[in-house]
């Protein structure tokens, strides 16, 4: 079984007052609150979501 590469994403800023699409993107990434960290598979779709809300999250490879 092949180990897939993962990426850790942490929400740094609040989603209050942000664009509805950006709030939905955070929800899609599984982020719920400030300092919440999730580990996701490193795929092009996940990277695209991260790029959309780059100013609210921190990414660790």
Swiss-Prot record:
One Pfam family this sequence matches: Ribosomal_L30
GO molecular function: structural constituent of ribosome
PROSITE patterns (UniProt xref): RIBOSOMAL_L30 (PS00634)
Keyword set, alphabetical order: Ribonucleoprotein, Ribosomal protein
SUPFAM superfamilies with a match to the protein in the record: Ribosomal protein L30p/L7e
InterPro entries reported for this sequence: Ribo_uL30_ferredoxin-like_sf, Ribosomal_uL30_bac-type, Ribosomal_uL30_CS, Ribosomal_uL30_ferredoxin-like
One GO-annotated biological process of the protein: translation
Record bears the keyword Chaperone: no
GO cellular component: cytosolic large ribosomal subunit
Subunit: Part of the 50S ribosomal subunit.
NCBIfam families (alphabetical): rpmD_bact
Family: Belongs to the universal ribosomal protein uL30 family.
Name of the protein described by the UniProt record: Large ribosomal subunit protein uL30
Organism annotation: Colwellia psychrerythraea (strain 34H / ATCC BAA-681) (Vibrio psychroerythus)
High-level lineage: Bacteria, Pseudomonadati, Pseudomonadota, Gammaproteobacteria, Alteromonadales
């Amino acid at each position: 079984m092949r180990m897939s590469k993962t990426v850790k994403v942490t929400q740094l800023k609040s989603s209050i007052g942000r664009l509805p699409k950006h709030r939905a993107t955070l929800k899609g990434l599984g982020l719920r609150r400030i300092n919440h960290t999730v580990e996701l598979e490193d795929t092009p779709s996940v990277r695209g979501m991260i790029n959309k809300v780059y100013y609210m999250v921190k990414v660790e490879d």
